[in-house]
């Protein structure tokens, strides 16, 4: 479908609106807005509920996002929710209330669907990657091999890890290592790379780039070998001051950065991993591509975008 498309992601940490222009060809991002929600903040073991104050905050965000999508003349919109809403005792009640607010349907993604869509997005931006895709949210950790034959969803997002570990990143890493060791298909990957998606993971890349004076401010396909990544992540887990300041990393992201580092470190310690590659596209782009008649996953992203730009701007 041509024209503009809006994707609203009701995540376990935040609620985000992204708007893409001309989704008939290769998508061009024109708007990206986020509201911190922390739905999974009290999600540990056992049952949990979405807190009313956070529900109210999300409802206000949805109202604002719907208005924004209409003002930007989006021809199509998809709204989806992930693990916190899926697993909360009052998740269904929240969805019914939210659907009345937006006047449309909210798709509740299963853990497998999250992993599949995240991998679809990741592979559209790094089509030559082979290995495992990691998508660490607030309430869950999704893992998929790049060939999309195997998917695993663990209830171990950064906020749930924080609760389960008693706010101890070292203990959180131990929890992750134990659970990751149970995943047999990780021993027989189609390649040797970790493809890390999401702005939280890219924050780790940005900190590493700043610490080592990397000359470009481009995190896409920035990669680290295991020994370098493990050493750097271990410093973040231990709360060491990196001695650098990076703009546009929010306090909320900084607070859970050690838990992101714990997840990445646990995977980098696998014997068959050669590097980690940080990707720009993720689950929202996967949702976008799932709505398109022709998904560009198999195309080179730079060539596809250049061709689309030439068609749009050429005279």
Residue map of PLM features:
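Conserved catalytic motifs of the protein kinase core domain
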Residues: 3, 32, 129
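Helical "lid/coupling" subdomains associated with nucleotide-phosphate turnover
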Residues: 19-22, 42-67, 71-74, 85-124, ...
